[in-house]
């Protein structure tokens, strides 16, 4: 469910000749202004930890990390306390910087290992990386038998009257989310989907919410 839309099942099925050694949960918001992962950590910490445990069992490792930038002290404190029930899961506070949420940067910050140049992948240094939204979706799929039909979306910006994180159905038009947050002034220059650094301007606000 990350921006790169890399298939989850591929990460959970390591290729022949590779050996997972740890699971790293990317709880670093990869773009400024985005806070969907932060809200999930604060509102669903128990579910996130169960999801991490499920992923670790699926890939056969006994060590998991949750990397959270240090500008989210409430999430760090909450997850650290909750993780006491999971001695194999460690919450790792990370320096606030861009692009800390990049897979290679995250792996280096958490483990000290560097992923070689492409076509090398995180699994080549023993890491399986998933983001918070995917962890929560895995929890719901396994524990509640719930298919993926909704996700948390951040709607924010200086022109947004009521910035919010919304639980939206896949396929919901963006303009409905914007209206839910109070709408936009008529002279709004552009609406960006995906974040201010790597996102793209939306030419049409009828575009739907996607899984990635």
Identify the residue ranges that each predicted region occupies:
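Conserved mixed alpha/beta catalytic, RNA-binding, or beta-rich assembly cores of soluble enzyme
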Residues: 1, 5, 16-19, 27-48, ...
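Hydrophobic alpha-helical positions that pack around
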Residues: 62-174, 180-185, 195
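Iron-sulfur-cluster electron-transfer modules
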Residues: 1-107
């Amino acid at each position: 469910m990350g921006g790169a839309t890399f298939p989850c099942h591929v990460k959970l099925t390591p290729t022949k000749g590779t050996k997972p050694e740890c699971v790293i949960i990317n709880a670093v918001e990869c773009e400024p202004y985005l806070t969907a992962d932060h809200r999930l950590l604060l509102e669903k910490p128990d579910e996130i930890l169960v999801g991490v445990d499920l992923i670790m069992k699926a890939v056969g490792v006994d060590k998991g990390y949750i990397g959270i930038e240090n500008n989210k002290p409430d999430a760090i404190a909450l997850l650290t306390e909750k993780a006491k029930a999971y001695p194999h899961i460690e919450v790792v506070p990370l320096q606030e910087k861009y692009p800390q949420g990049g897979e290679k940067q995250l792996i280096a910050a958490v483990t000290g290992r560097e992923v070689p140049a492409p076509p090398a992948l995180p699994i080549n240094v023993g890491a399986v990386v998933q983001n918070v939204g995917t962890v929560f979706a895995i929890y719901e799929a396994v524990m509640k038998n719930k298919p993926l039909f909704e996700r948390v979306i951040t709607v924010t910006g200086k022109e947004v009257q009521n910035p919010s994180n919304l639980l939206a159905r896949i396929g919901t038009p963006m303009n409905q989310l914007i209206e839910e947050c109070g709408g936009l002034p008529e002279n709004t220059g552009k609406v960006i989907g995906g974040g201010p650094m790597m996102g793209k301007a939306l030419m049409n606000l009828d575009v739907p919410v996607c899984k990635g």
